[in-house]
Design a protein with these regions (language model features):
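Conserved, well-structured core domains of diverse proteins
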Residues: 1-130, 137-141
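Long, contiguous bundles of hydrophobic transmembrane helices that form the permeation core
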Residues: 5-45, 330-432, 535-637, 665-673
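Membrane-water interface regions at transmembrane-helix termini and the short interhelical loops
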Residues: 37, 62-66, 88-99, 123-124, ...
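Structural signature of hydrophobic alpha-helical transmembrane segments
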Residues: 70-81, 128-140, 331-338, 398, ...
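Membrane-interfacial loop-to-helix junctions in multi-pass transporters
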Residues: 134-138, 201-214, 241-253, 285-291, ...
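Core transmembrane alpha-helical segments of multi-pass membrane transporters/permeases
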Residues: 149, 154, 164-179, 183, ...
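Transmembrane alpha-helix interface/packing and boundary motifs in multi-pass membrane proteins
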Residues: 222-226, 257-266, 298-304, 388, ...
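Hydrophobic transmembrane alpha-helices that form the pore/transport pathway of multi-pass ion
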Residues: 235-303, 309, 313, 322, ...
Length: 673
């Protein structure tokens, strides 16, 4: 989702063809959706479907039939490349119903990059002693070029350009015109492309390892859940529970979009798909176009920090840090709940301020009927959580939850999956994974260069210099780096690049590995709602018909807690519920923080988040004047800052302001009675 150089324009979705309008919005703000269109009766569609289904089956098969990592990952990248050259046009305005001859050549060459490693594997690993021959170098160059071209088609120009900058460094790293700290030894083609192609520290790095073993399977799991109708369940149950309440449709959007965003991890696509249902309802009861689009964007983006599935970067975090994914998911729970509490409370206070009522109960589905019809679709998610907490390997857990989804969906006729549905889910999952596969492969180029040279150490020392010995300043500059990269790059490379540079710098201040990586993880994701480049918000504006930039700033306001929470868990790690000091690498245990600390800090954070939301909206029980808003904002920040003194001051001021506001509300109601 990195086609950042777009000129946001609203699209009217209230015409006769809303599906076409939504597709136009999606293609405008989500580069990944600009694919070729094949008639299902044509041979090309069958070829793509067969390759995609085989690709998914391969990932299921290797969970129980492991092969050497280099071979496993090379096949993962090669088939992903092959599918990209079939599905994505060379240029966006190119004829999308045909595949040009050169893409068939690229298709074949993509397979060749993996076939070569499989055929030459023994010689590469044992006979050559790590020294590549000319053929190794040639195929390595071919693989890198194919990856860069595929990335250009899927994500746009920015990611390949960043990779090329890193790739150029070892060619010039010995030259005197570079700053002294960047000068290192000379590298030849064998050094560079041997590192990138023949080792698991380049194209086939830990990022691709996470992609093949974790991310692909969870994307596939999401495809099966979508096919079973779980999205409809989330919409219906949210409507049944919250639709009739004050500002109901907006609360429905937050809940349903959050859960769906957690499953599919695609913020822009989720805004368009879920927003096409929730945004018209929000507008109908009186929310403005800009606010409606912003609510959908904030909720969809937050799904990537919401357990149990979260965004793809969380799996990269598990692979990079060696920490069990279940531990990471548990640690992410409280911060995610705090974030969604902030969004829901702002929605609630906006509704109170403008007297926006919910939908009549008679027009809403009933909870009992929704649970009876589709409630069983929650079972696979419960199974997944159970398997993760039983320390089952993540890939195996994903496999069994996919099987569980098919079995559970068969419980009712309305959700039962036919053979055709299963094949479509296999194909859909493969296609949806391509953007992640190519992003991880390009990240591998960056990781390979950093591993080969001293570039990572240089960047770490640069961040330390900027921080000037201050943890807060180091965190601040890390946040800026994450957000700037997140505006121009997909979340995976933004996370990897920033974590590579910043995590060691934060470690110098005693920040535990898990906490440092979670900090970086958050800001790379919330760049999607940060103007001037806020693609999720722009997509929300497209669906709502609002002003893209106004919607972007409104989404930023709604998501403000997401920019505060990472600082909170750095200074008070008990908000992660995990004791990071007792967390070893390859940890499979769940060393909980002190329960008293968890309860105290979570409680004060909840009060602070509610107060922050009231201050931002200028409303609690009734309107808040400017002075009370500013005092409440300051008190909210005091209450969430770790420390007993700050908690007492913040909570006391909040209590006084809420009492004043409550009494004002009673007085106003008495006067109008």
């Amino acid at each position: 989702m990195s086609d950042k150089d777009v000129n946001p324009v609203s699209v009217d979705v209230e015409g006769n063809t809303p599906e076409d309008a939504n597709k136009e919005i999606l293609e405008k703000y989500d580069r990944e959706s600009k694919t070729r269109n094949f008639d299902n009766r044509k041979l090309l569609a069958w070829i793509v479907a067969i390759v995609a289904i085989a690709y998914s089956i391969y990932h299921l098969w290797i969970q129980f039939n492991p092969i050497p990592a280099l071979q496993q990952r090379s096949v993962h990248v090669a088939v992903g490349l092959a599918l990209i050259f079939l599905i994505y046009p060379t240029f966006s305005k190119q004829n999308r119903t045909k595949i040009p001859f050169y893409d068939w050549i690229f298709f074949g060459l993509s397979f060749f990059t993996a076939i070569y490693i499989i055929m030459e594997y023994t010689a590469i690993v044992t006979e050559r002693g790590g020294i590549p021959n000319n053929m190794d170098i040639a195929v390595g160059i071919l693989a890198v070029l194919l990856v860069l071209e595929a990335a250009r088609r899927v994500t746009g120009l920015i990611l390949p350009i960043v990779a090329l900058v890193f790739l150029a460094y070892p060619f010039f790293s010995h030259m005197d015109f570079l700053p002294m700290r960047l000068i290192t030894r000379e590298f030849d083609l064998g050094d560079i492309f041997g590192q990138l192609y023949l080792k698991t520290e380049g194209l086939y790095s830990t990022a691709i390892g996470a992609s093949v073993n974790y991310i692909f399977l969870f994307i596939l799991f999401g495809a099966f859940l979508t096919k079973s109708g779980l999205g409809q369940f989330f919409n219906d149950i949210a409507m049944a529970l919250a639709g009739h309440r004050q500002g109901g449709p907006a609360k429905v959007a937050v809940v349903s979009s959050g859960f769906m965003g957690s499953i599919n991890g695609a913020a822009v696509a989720n805004v368009v798909s879920t927003g096409s249902f929730t945004i018209p309802l929000m507008k109908k009861i009186g929310y403005s176009k800009n606010f409606a689009g912003a609510v959908e964007a904030s909720a969809s983006v937050g799904g990537q920090v919401l357990p149990p599935i979260m965004g793809a970067s969380a799996f990269i975090m598990a692979e990079t840090t060696g920490i069990n994914y279940g531990v990471i998911a548990l640690a992410a729970l409280v911060p995610a709940v705090l974030y969604y509490l902030a969004v829901i409370m702002q929605v609630h206070y906006r509704a109170g301020k403008r007297d926006l009522r919910g939908i009549p109960k008679a027009d809403l589905p009933r909870v009992k009927e929704v649970m009876k019809e589709r409630g069983h679709l929650l079972i696979p998610i419960v199974v997944l959580i159970g398997l993760l907490f039983q320390n089952m390997p993540v890939g195996h857990a994903a496999f069994w939850t996919i099987v569980t989804t098919v079995v559970v969906a068969s419980f009712r006729k309305t959700t039962r999956m036919s053979i055709n549905d299963i094949l479509e889910a296999l194909s859909m999952g493969a296609r949806q994974s391509l953007a992640v596969v190519i992003a991880c492969a390009v990240v591998g180029i960056i990781i390979g260069v950093v591993s080969l040279t001293s570039f990572g150490t240089v960047m770490t020392s640069s961040i330390q210099s900027l921080g000037a010995g201050s943890l807060f300043l180091t965190l601040f500059f890390t946040m800026l780096a994450s957000m700037i990269l997140g505006m121009g790059l997909p979340s995976i490379p933004a996370y990897i690049i920033t974590a590579t540079m910043a995590a060691p710098a934060l470690a110098e201040f005693g920040v535990p590995v898990l906490v440092a990586h979670m900090f970086v993880f958050y800001f790379g994701i919330f760049a999607n709602v940060t103007p001037p480049v806020a693609l999720a918000a722009f997509a929300g504006a497209g669906v709502s018909g609002g002003n893209p930039m106004y919607t972007g700033f409104q989404a930023l306001k709604l998501s403000l807690a997401g920019f505060i929470i990472p600082y909170l868990f750095v200074f008070e790690p008990s908000l992660l519920m995990i004791n990071p000091e007792g967390l070893a690498t390859n940890a499979t245990e769940f060393p909980l923080a002190d329960v008293g600390d968890i309860v105290l800090n979570v409680s004060t954070a909840v009060v602070g988040i509610i107060a922050l939301s009231a201050a931002l909206e200028g409303y609690f029980r009734t309107h808040l004047n400017v002075v009370l808003r500013l005092l409440l904002l300051a008190a909210a920040l005091f209450s969430v800052v770790p420390g007993l003194t700050s908690d007492i001051i913040g909570l006391s001021v909040i209590l006084v302001i809420f009492i004043i506001n409550f009494m004002t509300d009673r007085k106003e109601k008495a006067q109008t009675a």
